[in-house]
Amino acid sequence: MEEFDYISEFPDCLLTQILLNLPTKDSVKTSVLSKRWRNLWLNVPGLRLRTFDFPVFPYPYEEGFVRFMDRFMEFKCRSRLQKFMITYFEHNGYRDRLMELIGTLVDRGIQHLYVYMHTCNRVDFIRQNIYKSKTLVSLKLYNVELKNPEFVVSLPCLKILKLENIFHGEDGPLVVEKLISGCPVLEDLELIRPFDDNVGYGSLTAPKYSRNRDIIGDFLTVISSVRHTIICYSTSKMLYSYSKQLGPIPQFHNLYHLQARFSSSSLQLLPTFLESCPACPNLKNLIMEFPFEPKNIDFHKVPQCLISTLEYVQIEELILKEKSGIKLVDYFLENSAVLKKLTLSFTYHSKKKQDPESYKKLLTSTKLSPTCQIIID
């Protein structure tokens, strides 16, 4: 049977969009396929690079990266990139050139910017034009330093923001608050604190914490419009402390996807948090992680979202026990009226020790939603 090359029938505009999803080093390799493909990668509206992918001879790979980008930007001088993703490993001090390059990309109207810095020293990343970008739709930063801007941030198109291992100097959360407050259409927000971030909240009612209290309150108000959020244990603890000491947290009217990580002692925060935000009238997806066996589960509150909107629940890293894991599962099955699927995944260690009777009890739990499926992963 004669083979047919369907890909060659695709127009160039479709091929470049396909190549956009590949690392640039793989996109470049397609240039050997045929004469048509020789320069096609140059028309891809984005780059996905790692500095150590460049050869170390005759230049250090960082210099090779800079030379490559200079030539590429010269070739694309009259067009703008949709996406730029860089994983930067620094050894010879070319970060200033990288920052200049990113500033140029922003000036040219970049839409998606992802920067992952692997350096020994913190890098002051954001330039003024990034704070004022009219085209950025998604921004993801790792291991950089953000300094407090002395002007109003304006990112009118930014919908996705991820900040991981970010350093803020002396101004702390105020920097993030300013950044988020300038994003009127923000939908997805992910904040992951550095491992050595020792910020504590203490008693928020104490006078010495008044500044933190105000910052947290303003910050919660700013992020209350997000649709998708991921929170760690320390964040859930802060929310719980705020609601207990200072009153209800702002309502998250648009929130439809919540992912949270709990310790063995903090699970009790879950219904309180959900109830504190009636706040979740649109919540449909809930993902929970438990690196330890949950204890002292005694849920009496049933948030409105469980009754009216919650459709998918996923519980990860669970260890089933008669009075903990099963009770947690029962809580959702017995109170979620429109639940469509409950997915349970267990730690490898837990799977080896699991009592088969535990699975049977899960499958026979009383379900308020008759169509709910229980998936054991």
Curated annotation (Swiss-Prot):
It comes from Arabidopsis thaliana. Pfam families: F-box (PF00646), FBD (PF08387). Residues 297-346 form the FBD domain. Signal peptide: none annotated. Residues 4-50 form the F-box domain. SUPFAM superfamilies: F-box domain (SSF81383), RNI-like (SSF52047). SMART domains: FBD, FBOX. This is Putative FBD-associated F-box protein At5g44940.
